[in-house]
Amino acid sequence: MKLLTSLVFCSLLLGVCHGGFFSFVHEAFQGAGDMWRAYTDMKEANWKNSDKYFHARGNYDAAQRGPGGVWAAEKISDGREAFQEFFGRGHEDTIADQEANRHGRSGKDPNYYRPPGLPDKY
């Protein structure tokens, strides 16, 4: 637990060095909201083969907020994938999800993963 706390603190510290503390925290909260919106949209759409698109879109939207959004997207994505892999989800699917996450966080177009026919609402 001490190691995890130290890692989170160091990650926050590194992110804060890039800008003000309150700005970083604000961006992180907004980025977490972007990730949540992508998740709820994915559940609402219930569209076959859309998982990677929503991963990329959530990370992309969060990263557009700034360093705090990037940090939040990375921690949320890594945590979600670690949790799912721990409970037996396929390793190959986890790798593909992480690639979509990195794609979005790097600022690349999330529509690269958009499945055909997904309604324009998303």
Curated annotation (Swiss-Prot):
A GO MF term: heparin binding
Distribution of this protein across tissues and organs: Detected in blood plasma (at protein level). Detected in liver.
Cell compartments where the protein resides: Secreted
Main localization, broad class: secreted
GO biological process, one term: cholesterol metabolic process
Cleaved signal peptide residues: 1-19
Biased composition (Basic and acidic residues): 91-108
The entry's keywords: Acute phase, HDL, Heparin-binding, Secreted, Signal
UniProt-listed PANTHER family: SERUM AMYLOID A, SERUM AMYLOID A PROTEIN
Protein name: Serum amyloid A-1 protein
Species annotation: Mus musculus
Protein's gene: Saa1
